[in-house]
């Protein structure tokens, strides 16, 4: 081996390995201090791209869970208000039944009606003041809202809220009033026993297309006016018949989803003088000062309660769906974060071993470099 002083190959080699050990030590210290084994694209370009994509998905899932919880909160707020509205209308129904009793005087019915009117005001107050985050929920202004319950576009759920104001036509129906009263001695004429009520857009034709729904009733011959009302009530849950004190028949038809004008026809309709121009009746229009009005109020309130109950059922289903969505989102986020951790996070057991190895190599390299720098001094002994 040649002895030279201009080029110290041994020192250069020792310095190269020392630099390598120092770089490895710095990398290990960076990974241990940051907690991530990928701190820049040079560490793992492909891994960084995958990790960033998983991070975006995880953060999106976190926001989606908050959105779903907001949806549950809105549904709970609206459903709680509807529960109170139901209690109000149940009380009004009790009053209507009480007012229908023949023992009540006009003054007593007037007092009952005043309480009913106060409850109508309370129902409207509930509808107008129930809000969430500044948005009114039950006065008809909310409409439909989309709740983003996923980390990607298109993963939304639509929630709709409708009005429960007392003057909403869906909170009631229409009433056909008879112009001719019948006494106890009257009986259904078998030649005029047919009655047909047509509800536009509530049925289907043979091809499954939207069509009118026809409720055909053939009354029993000889039935008096009260027996006729009882018979009509048993034919469909969409209609309710009652009789006033003067023997006049009134038929109430609930129509929350009817599109168009409801009509009535048939021999019985002509016999009783049932007008083909029904009166639209909502909770706002209830009048309990007469037996006829009280009887009609019962039917209107039954329709309104059914309508509100259907809205509450829909909100309950939405809440359950959102709860399951949150559980699913949490499960997805857990697995996404676990995958991201395997790609990006530092394995401390492995990295501390690497750091210890790099420290030893750095110390050894420093010592060897110091010795290698002394090798040219051996040339001086040849000059002595």
From Swiss-Prot:
Organism the protein comes from: Vibrio parahaemolyticus serotype O3:K6 (strain RIMD 2210633)
Location in the cell reads: Secreted; Bacterial flagellum
Q: What is its main location?
A: secreted
Q: What does this protein do?
A: Flagellin is the subunit protein which polymerizes to form the filaments of bacterial flagella. FlaC is not essential for polar flagellar synthesis and swimming motility. Homomer of FlaC is not able to form a functional filament.
Write down the InterPro entries for this protein, in alphabetical order.
Answer: Flagellin, Flagellin_C, Flagellin_C_sub2, Flagellin_hook_IN_motif, Flagellin_N
* Cellular component aspect of the GO annotation: bacterial-type flagellum; extracellular region
Tell me yes or no: is Secreted among this UniProt entry's keywords: yes
Record-linked Gene3D superfamilies? 2.60.40.4390, 6.10.280.190, f41 fragment of flagellin, N-terminal domain, Flagellar export chaperone, C-terminal domain
GO MF terms held by the record:
structural molecule activity
Q: Fill in the subunit field for this protein.
A: Heteromer of multiple flagellin subunits including FlaA, FlaB/D, FlaC, FlaE and FlaF. Homomer of FlaC is not able to form a functional filament.
- Where, if anywhere, are coiled coils annotated? 317-347
Listed name of the protein: Polar flagellin C
Kindly give any further remark recorded in the entry.
Answer: V.parahaemolyticus possesses two flagellar systems: a single polar flagellum propels the bacterium in liquid (swimming), while multiple lateral (peritrichous) flagella move the bacterium over surfaces (swarming). The polar flagellum is synthesized constitutively but lateral flagella are produced only under conditions in which the polar flagellum is not functional.
- Alphabetical UniProt keywords: Bacterial flagellum, Coiled coil, Secreted
Organism lineage string: Bacteria, Pseudomonadati, Pseudomonadota, Gammaproteobacteria, Vibrionales
**Which NCBIfam families does the UniProt entry name for this protein?**
PRK08869.1-1, PRK08869.1-3
Q: List the disulfide bonds.
A: none
Instruction: Family membership, please give it.
Output: Belongs to the bacterial flagellin family.
């Amino acid at each position: 081996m040649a002895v030279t002083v201009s080029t110290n190959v041994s020192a250069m080699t020792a310095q190269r390995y020392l630099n390598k050990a120092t770089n490895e030590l710095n990398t290990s210290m960076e990974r241990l201090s940051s907690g991530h084994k990928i701190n820049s694209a040079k560490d793992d370009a492909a891994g960084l791209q995958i990790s960033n994509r998983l991070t975006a998905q995880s953060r999106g899932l976190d926001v989606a869970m908050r959105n779903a919880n907001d949806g549950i909160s809105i549904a709970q707020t609206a459903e709680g208000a509807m529960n109170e509205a139901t209690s109000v209308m149940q009380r009004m129904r009790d009053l209507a039944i009480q007012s229908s009793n023949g023992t009540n005087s006009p003054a007593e019915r007037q007092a009952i009606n005043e309480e009913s009117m106060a409850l109508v005001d309370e129902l409207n107050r509930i509808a107008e003041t129930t809000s969430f985050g500044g948005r009114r929920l039950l006065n008809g202004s909310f409409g439909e809202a989309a709740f983003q319950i996923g980390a990607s576009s298109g993963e939304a759920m639509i929630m709709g809220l409708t009005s429960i104001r007392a003057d909403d036509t869906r909170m009631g129906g229409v009433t056909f009033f008879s112009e001719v009263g019948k006494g106890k001695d009257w009986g259904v004429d078998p030649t005029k026993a047919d009655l047909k009520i047509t509800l536009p857009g509530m049925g289907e034709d043979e091809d499954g297309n939207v069509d009118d729904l026809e409720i055909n009733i053939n009354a029993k011959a000889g039935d008096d006016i009260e027996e006729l009302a009882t018979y009509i009530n048993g034919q469909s849950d969409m209609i309710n018949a009652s009789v006033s004190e003067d023997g006049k028949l009134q038929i109430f038809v609930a129509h929350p989803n009817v599109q168009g004008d409801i009509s009535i026809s048939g021999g019985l309709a002509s016999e009783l003088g049932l007008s083909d121009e029904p009166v639209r009746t909502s909770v706002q229009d209830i009048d309990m000062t007469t037996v006829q009005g009280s009887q009609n109020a019962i039917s209107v309130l039954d329709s309104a309660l059914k309508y509100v109950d259907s809205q509450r059922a829909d909100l309950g289903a939405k809440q359950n769906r959102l709860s399951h969505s949150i559980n699913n989102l949490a499960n997805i986020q857990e697995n996404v974060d676990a995958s991201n951790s395997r790609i990006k996070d530092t394995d401390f057991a492995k990295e501390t071993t690497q750091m210890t190895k790099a420290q030893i190599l750095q110390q050894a390299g420093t010592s060897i470099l110091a010795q290698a720098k002394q090798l040219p001094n051996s040339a001086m002994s040849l000059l002595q």
